[in-house]
């Protein structure tokens, strides 16, 4: 081999090594950037989102205040009122539920925020939302308190529930037999 050939091979080797090192550096930068983006996403999603959501009283998924979520509730009540139900083959032959007159007797309606039921008011302040429809309570809204466990629900929600079940939706305690 001549010295020109050695120089050409040496130049090609150096250029190949430089390209290889450049690609390795680019790959490391790409991996580090991806890791940084992932860390930022986790911080925002797991740490800041719940904090900002409760402090600003915003639902970050749809960008509205919680009091403006009536569309979801109307849809839920529409589904209940139309009677759409999935078949329950275990109870097909035996009807377990209460008539509206029995529900009215066992669980009288109460208005939220009236102060005439202090213990119930404390429960509603603890939960701040109906466990059935997941909507918050509004002042002067009709609610019912489950007599056994004192859980509070919207009247329409618990009425629909009690027409098919004889237990509390939250803790599954049975209604008193009377």
Swiss-Prot record:
Compartment(s): Membrane
Catalytic reaction list: S-ubiquitinyl-[E2 ubiquitin-conjugating enzyme]-L-cysteine + [acceptor protein]-L-lysine = [E2 ubiquitin-conjugating enzyme]-L-cysteine + N(6)-ubiquitinyl-[acceptor protein]-L-lysine
Cellular component per GO, a single term: membrane
Protein name, per record: Putative RING-H2 finger protein ATL19
Classification via Gene3D superfamilies: Zinc/RING finger domain, C3HC4 (zinc finger)
Naturally occurring in which organism (per UniProt): Arabidopsis thaliana (Mouse-ear cress)
SMART domains in the cross-refs: RING
GO molecular function annotations of the record: transferase activity; zinc ion binding
Membrane topology note: Single-pass membrane protein
UniProt pathway: Protein modification; protein ubiquitination
Pfam families the UniProt entry points to: zf-RING_2 (PF13639)
UniProt family annotation: Belongs to the RING-type zinc finger family. ATL subfamily.
